[in-house]
């Protein structure tokens, strides 16, 4: 951490949905840091009231209010944690004048462009967004097999194939997850999220074994939209008869990491974290594969 990041004062948390904000609060508190929380009304869990000592609610479009509250709290550096559903970002918000002006100026209307622009506005206001995994490094896996079982030859071939597909769709800001069977792409994530993508793949594959690959974006900005795997994903994989999961090492958060790996081991699911610069080459041999129409 830099000198600024080792300070216990001036910390804020911009909270979306899910467990991510709670984990950041716990991680920061373990280092003696008490965060002021700006919680998004449309997304953040009401239970944050019990977890945060200083909490303020704002709507998705209230950028000016959020900045004013952070100034009042003395926030100079902040973590953005928790999902904001992609379909809400441009369709469900009522922007204040500052956000409306920002939206009008965007060259492309996508999530990365918007949040990147918000980060620049915050920076101009003296509030620096930092790596959202800063307080959760034990939950970010290094390269290697995380479960008792390593992917077998079939799964390794599907992982190699899936990495190529996933890299392509993530570079186009379509999604970050693909589901593969016998080196055929069964499902590609869009706005529905990883778990729904796996469920859809199960319906399409009709019992064929599946492999799930989830990657980061090229040049992943660790301040926001970091890939996350949680217990519900492993549960969904189990239901879908998915037998292996590959994620990016150093760029993925595994919520409830110990329990997640135990659950995967119990289900016979192999999990491998792969260094983006050292991806395995796709095997040359062919296999029958699933028919694609």
For every predicted segment, state its role:
Residues 17, 83-86, 184, 217-218:
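Short glycine-rich anion-binding loops that position phosphate/pyrophosphate groups of nucleotides
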Residues 2-40:
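N-terminal basic/disordered segments at the start of proteins
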Residues 13-15, 37-38, 78-81, 111, ...:
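General beta-strand structural signal in soluble alpha/beta enzymes
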Residues 40-75, 92-101, 196-293:
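Feature captures the catalytic cores and cofactor-binding loops of soluble hydro-lyases/lyases
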Residues 28, 42, 128-234:
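Conserved mixed alpha/beta catalytic, RNA-binding, or beta-rich assembly cores of soluble enzyme
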Residues 33, 38, 48, 58-92, ...:
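Conserved alpha/beta cores of soluble small-molecule-handling proteins
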Residues 94-150:
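Hydrophobic alpha-helical segments and helix pairs
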Residues 6-10, 31-34, 52-53, 73-76, ...:
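Short coil/turn connectors at secondary-structure junctions
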């Amino acid at each position: 951490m830099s000198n600024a990041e080792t300070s216990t004062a001036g910390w804020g948390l911009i909270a979306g949905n899910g467990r991510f904000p709670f984990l950041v609060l716990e991680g920061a508190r373990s280092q003696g840091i008490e965060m002021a929380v700006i919680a998004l009304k449309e997304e953040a869990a009401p239970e944050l009231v019990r977890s945060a000592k200083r909490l303020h609610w704002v709507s998705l479009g209230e950028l000016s209010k959020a900045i004013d509250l952070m100034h009042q709290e003395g926030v100079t550096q902040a973590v953005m944690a928790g999902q904001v559903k992609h379909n809400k970002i441009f369709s469900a918000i009522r922007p204040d004048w500052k956000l409306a002006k920002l939206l009008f100026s965007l060259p492309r209307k996508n999530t990365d462009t918007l949040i990147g622009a918000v980060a620049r506005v915050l920076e101009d206001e003296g509030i620096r967004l930092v790596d959202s995994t800063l307080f959760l490094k034990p939950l970010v896996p290094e390269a290697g097999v995380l479960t008792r079982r390593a992917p077998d030859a079939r799964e390794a071939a599907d992982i190699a194939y899936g990495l190529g597909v996933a890299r392509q769709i993530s570079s186009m800001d379509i999604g970050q997850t693909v589901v593969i069977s016998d080196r055929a792409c069964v499902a590609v994530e869009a706005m529905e999220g990883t778990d729904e993508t796996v469920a859809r793949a199960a319906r399409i594959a009709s019992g064929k074994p599946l492999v799930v690959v989830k990657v980061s974006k090229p040049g992943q900005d660790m301040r926001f939209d970091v890939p996350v795997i949680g217990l519900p994903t492993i549960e969904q994989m189990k239901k879908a008869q998915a037998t292996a999961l590959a994620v990016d090492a150093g760029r993925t958060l595994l919520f409830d990491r110990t329990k997640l790996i135990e659950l995967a081991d119990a289900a016979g699911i192999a999990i491998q974290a792969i260094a983006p610069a050292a991806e395995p080459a796709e095997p040359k041999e062919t296999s029958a594969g699933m028919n694609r129409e």
